Regions:
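Fe(II)/2-oxoglutarate oxygenase catalytic core
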Residues: 1-134
Length: 134
């Protein structure tokens, strides 16, 4: 069993980073998400650890490039990659994920420590309610 991480208060610039305006055309990306019909359902619809529904291959390589460049610069990482366990398990990445208000509560985004070192979330909410943080 892996050693659990000790809790330390998250600090911007060490444990997390914020990139405003990450997408050149967020409205276009939102329209792409809304047009998708190939959704995979998670909790509570299916026995998955993740809530809501997902569609794979969300952003194009051109849309991902500036985000990945920011991550590499901010973290000092020379490369970004998708890991696989010896058993063949992997993470989904570059997904649209829609989560309804009754499908989950507020919580941080986390991924398996066996498979990933960095995780990112791009919020696409065209008219977020006041004080929602998106």
């Amino acid at each position: 069993m892996p050693t659990p991480l000790l809790y330390r208060k998250p600090q911007e610039g060490r444990d997390y980073w914020i990139l405003d305006g990450a997408l050149k055309d967020p409205e276009g990306v939102l329209a792409q998400a809304q047009a998708r019909e190939d959704w995979i359902y998670g909790f509570p619809h299916k026995p998955e650890p993740w809530p809501g529904m997902r569609a794979l291959d969300a952003l194009t390589a051109e849309e991902l490039e500036p985000i990945e460049a920011f991550v590499q610069k901010a973290t000092g990482s020379k490369r970004l990659w998708q890991g696989t366990t010896p058993e063949g398990a992997t993470l989904n990445h570059n997904c649209f994920q829609l989560v309804g208000k009754d499908e989950s509560g507020p919580r941080p985004h986390t991924d398996s420590l066996k498979l990933c070192r960095y995780a990112a979330v791009v919020y696409l909410n065209p008219k977020p309610p006041e004080g929602t943080g998106t």
